[in-house]
Amino acid sequence: MAETLTGKTPVFGGSTGGLLKSAETEEKYAITWTSTKEQVFELPTGGAAVMHEGDNLLYFARKEQALALGTQLRTKFKPKIESYKIYRFFPGADVGYLHPKDGVFPEKVNEGRSFAGKVDRRIGQNPNPATIKFTGKQPYTA
């Protein structure tokens, strides 16, 4: 995937504590988003930064940091910023699109998304674990 990311890095004073130095030999993560106005936000690595109006691009050493910033963008700002995307950069210059994988956030309903672990019954219809204890069946398959 030969995709180039565009956007300006938010303005912040400080450093990443050397985290991105190791990301040059391992992997790093980038988050991109579009803001309708210039506003201050908290960095998951500590400190604060000012996002630009328009496209923004920020690199992190860990996926959790990018996901934390994405959650903050969706919940703390008016209007909510839901147009963010997270990418993974591998050392060999390969780029992989990471989140949201199929274009819809995991907690939203998406037509065609398959169910994971769905059992067609109510909680009251679950079997009593004592009745299946020594049968060799697992409670989640009974």
UniProtKB/Swiss-Prot annotation:
Belongs to the PsaD family. The keyword Cytoplasm does not apply. Keywords: Photosynthesis, Photosystem I. GO terms for biological process: photosynthesis. The keyword S-adenosyl-L-methionine does not apply. One of its GO terms (cellular component) is photosystem I reaction center. This is Photosystem I reaction center subunit II. Residues 119-142 are annotated as: Disordered. Gene3D superfamilies: Photosystem I PsaD, reaction center subunit II. PsaD can form complexes with ferredoxin and ferredoxin-oxidoreductase in photosystem I (PS I) reaction center. It comes from Synechococcus sp. (strain ATCC 27144 / PCC 6301 / SAUG 1402/1). InterPro entries: PsaD, PsaD_sf.
